[in-house]
């Protein structure tokens, strides 16, 4: 029986960007739940003047440049003696000013102090991300109400910008830049899983697996059970599983087995949390090989046990891969049940039909083979392997039959279909059937098995779930030399395609 799916062993990219609402800067802000974060913004004089300058900066944000007012605030609140009286109001205003400065395109995050308003040590450097964190930490520590108020402050535009920069950089494999941006993001806010997820990928790229594991744990902890972060949790679990699998593949001896067990745990954790189908399919494929490496082949049926009892919870591809795993481990009854679940959902799934027929043959359920092969050859008529399934079926029926007349009839049918398969002058095979939001692509080959060079025309109907023809495409193929093959491709922008059939080649 042919293996249908190779291990889908790739790491999906992080989300391209994140978005969040940006709260406005407030005077004596109210925290969540109605509790107030109160501090007096009228004293000392430096705080009062900075409060007025902040109001002017807010007005300038509408269409002007608030940088002069922001520099004034920084200068006032860092003057000699300004730190000691009313430190919470000072820190709140200073953190707000630094955040707004980070939004200005002319201000560098690592800036010369004088450019942001400092008069003390004016030629030194200031890290505005660290400065924001230091200021807002003072406010957070002043009361629970203020701590609640500061949370949305930390996730304003500068945090969004640097976090998205980290995501974009890691997706572009610019890992050094991604690390810088992610750590700046964490300086502003440590409650989001996104920067930890970025750093997980960065350390994976460096093969620094202890650091990767640490960041992965932090990402999962930050994501918690929040449904907003479901994609992040799945991404992290997939990273952990694929990394442990890769390490197991390159390891030897006891370490190889230990890493295989680690990967098994990671894949099972992923499967327990309802991953998207492509990752569920990867989990099934990888778990099968990992159990062998770990010396625990007896556990392979556990991979698909829940699929047998509740196939509706799983996608077509994952069920198909599970059927392959079951058949490879000589469990044709399980394989047949899984392939049948695919066919019940999608009667135009030729790989499932092919393997379902083969599973019935292994089970000696010969009378179940015919209807399956009839459907298969209706979809895929110019593949001799499909017609050979009839020959295997009649061979089984013939051997089990006691009545001479029926034995002879079955023998005649066996010879008929075996001859048809052997003498078919061409063979159609498919190498890709991909479907996504951009359309549908079918790629295959035609082999000239006998005779002179010949050209063919592939005419393919793409079918929806009800069997309706969504699109008909044709592709000229040839001339094809004897004993040679040529590729064909048929593409359409049509979506909603679940299967295909083609006209018999002549």
Predicted features and spans:
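Hydrophobic/aromatic packing residues within the alpha-helices of TPR/SEL1-like helical repeat arrays
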Residues: 70, 77, 129-132, 136, ...
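Canonical positions in the second alpha-helix
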Residues: 80, 135-139, 184-185, 218-219, ...
């Amino acid at each position: 029986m042919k293996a249908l799916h190779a291990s889908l062993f790739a790491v999906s990219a992080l989300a391209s960007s994140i978005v969040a609402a940006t709260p406005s800067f407030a005077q004596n802000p109210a925290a969540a739940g109605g509790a107030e974060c109160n501090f007096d913004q009228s004293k000392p004089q430096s705080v009062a003047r900075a409060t007025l300058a902040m109001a002017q900066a807010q007005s300038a944000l509408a269409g002007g440049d608030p940088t002069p007012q922001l520099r004034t605030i920084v200068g006032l609140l860092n003057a000699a003696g300004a730190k000691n009286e009313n430190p919470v109001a000072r820190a709140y205003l200073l953190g707000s000013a630094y955040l707004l400065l980070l939004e200005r395109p002319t201000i560098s995050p690592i800036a010369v102090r004088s450019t942001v308003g400092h008069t003390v040590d004016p030629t030194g450097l200031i890290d505005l991300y660290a400065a924001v964190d230091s200021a807002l930490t003072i406010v957070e520590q002043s009361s629970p109400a203020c701590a609640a108020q500061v949370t949305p402050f930390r996730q304003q535009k500068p945090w969004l910008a640097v976090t998205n920069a980290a995501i974009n950089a890691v997706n572009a494999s610019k890992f050094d830049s991604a690390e810088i941006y992610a750590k700046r993001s964490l300086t502003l806010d440590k409650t989001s899983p996104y920067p930890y997820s970025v750093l997980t990928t960065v350390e994976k790229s460096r093969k620094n697996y202890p650091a990767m594991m640490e960041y992965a744990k932090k990402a999962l902890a930050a994501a918690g059970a929040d449904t907003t972060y479901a994609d992040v949790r799945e991404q992290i679990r997939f990273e952990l599983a694929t990394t442990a699998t890769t390490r197991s593949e390159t390891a030897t001896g006891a370490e190889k087995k230990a890493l295989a067990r680690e990967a098994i745990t990671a894949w099972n954790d992923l499967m327990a949390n309802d991953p998207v189908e492509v990752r569920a399919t990867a989990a099934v494929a990888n778990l099968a090989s990992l159990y062998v490496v770990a010396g625990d082949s007896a556990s392979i049926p556990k991979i698909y046990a829940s699929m047998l009892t509740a196939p509706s919870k799983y996608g077509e591809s994952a069920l198909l891969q599970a059927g392959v795993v079951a058949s490879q481990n000589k469990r044709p009854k399980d394989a047949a049940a899984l392939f049948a679940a695919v066919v019940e959902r999608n009667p135009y799934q030729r790989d499932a039909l092919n393997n379902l027929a083969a599973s019935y043959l292994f089970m000696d359920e010969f009378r179940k083979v015919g209807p399956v092969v009839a459907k298969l050859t209706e979809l895929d008529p110019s593949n001799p392997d499909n017609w050979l399934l009839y020959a295997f079926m009649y061979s089984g029926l013939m051997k089990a039959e006691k009545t001479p007349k029926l034995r002879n009839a079955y023998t005649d049918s066996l010879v008929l279909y075996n001859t048809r398969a052997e003498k078919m002058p061409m063979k159609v095979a498919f190498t890709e059937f991909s479907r996504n939001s951009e359309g549908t692509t079918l790629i295959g080959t035609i082999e000239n098995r006998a005779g002179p060079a010949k050209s063919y025309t592939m005419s393919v109907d793409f079918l929806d779930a009800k069997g309706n023809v969504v699109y008909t495409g044709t592709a000229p193929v040839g001339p094809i030399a004897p004993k040679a093959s040529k590729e064909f491709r048929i593409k359409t922008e049509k979506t909603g395609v679940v299967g295909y059939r083609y006209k018999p080649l002549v």
